[in-house]
Amino acid sequence: MGIFLAVPEIIAASIAGGAEALSIAGSGAAIATGEGLAALGGITEGAALLGETIPISEAATTVLTKVPELVQATQAVTAAVQGGAGLVGGIYTALASDHPGDLPPNTPTGSASGLHPTSGYNPQGAGLNLQSVHKPIHAPYSGMALVPIPEYQLETGIPGIPDWLFNLVASYLPELPSLQDVFNRIAFGIWSSYYNAGSTVVNRVLSDEIQRLLRDLEYGFRATLASIGESDPVNAIATQVRSLASTARERELLQITAGQPLDLSRPTSALSAAAGALTEAAYNFIYDASSLPKDGFNALSEGVHRLGQWISFSGPTGGTPHYATPDWILYVLEQLNADTYKIPTQAVKRKQDELHPVSPTKKANKAKKSSSPGTNSGNRSKKRRGRSTSRSTTVRRNRI
């Protein structure tokens, strides 16, 4: 990781001795892969055997020796591959230009090797406003020259991300968004992505499970103000899943109590239905995950995150707010909408009728109907009176 501290030195050397290093290595790819360093060794060894000295500048030597090490370090750390590819791509672009240190008007497209910058590379939009310290450079447009990264400390660091890398983003932002803004954007991102997916959006918006999920997420973000260690929303999600599992078991017990136990007589059809539901859930998950917007030049593929909290910031395409939704939130949302948590509404209604007896208003209505005037009701009352008197006389006679 110490090679990252030498990034300003590498960029400055690429400006001063980039053309010389490119002529020695033959190509920018050879510099990045280490072939240029081998070529440099062959030249110096051959000159030593002949007893001659070939003047090679210190800047060119730095480029040939440090760039391969930087490439290996960025590829070894998976979390910094995206940022390393863009950084090395910027160095390569500076070396491949007609005037070392300037970026050509037409930037190459991205490649899997990380040697070229990604499509739409715009360092100025991503917060790179670099100026040369060695000589004035005439870039295709202002602010596009590569120079050492400004060194200043970040007041609040982010675990797992070097300060100098985050400074590239922080220099473009006037201030970081508040926790409430972060939560609102994440919630809006979840709703909008699922709405655009078009899969049972009404049920998901109106479901109590989603409301409880968002409340748990909000609680997780608010807890950050008290302690960083207690702000991880993953714990809240895990608790939510456990509570949903217990709720599902309670609903099954309600079904059995209501007289509708689970149908186990057809295991084959039940298994096939479960497999179909799982396939549909997986398809929805993949579709929704693929439709999520991604920033073109974020340092990480999922944005900058702090212990599970995803921070949104403007991208290089014009100040549009971007967000990144982690996969576990999508997974939990899919689980909340799974068929295992759905039970027949008939059983629920029957159980509710048993738990909630007839209301007093219904009883009053029945009493009014029974007391309404009518011949039948009068005859019935007379018959009842006659029966009661006859019974009382017989009892008295027996007693006498």
Curated annotation (Swiss-Prot):
Q: Name one GO biological process term.
A: symbiont entry into host cell
Q: Motif (Nuclear localization signal) spans which residues?
A: 359-369
Output the Gene Ontology cellular-component terms: host cell; host cell endoplasmic reticulum membrane; host cell nucleus; membrane; viral capsid
Q: Where is this region: Disordered?
A: 99-118, 348-400
Name of the protein in question: Minor capsid protein VP2
Could you tell me which residues belong to the region D1? 307-342
Keyword terms: Capsid protein, Host endoplasmic reticulum, Host membrane, Host nucleus, Late protein, Lipoprotein, Membrane, Myristate, Viral penetration into host nucleus, Virion, Virus entry into host cell
Q: Where is the lipid attached (N-myristoyl glycine)?
A: 2
The biased composition feature labelled Low complexity covers 370-379
State the family it belongs to.
Belongs to the polyomaviruses capsid protein VP2 family.
| Top-level taxon | Viruses
Tell me the classification of the organism that encodes this protein: Viruses, Monodnaviria, Shotokuvirae, Cossaviricota, Papovaviricetes
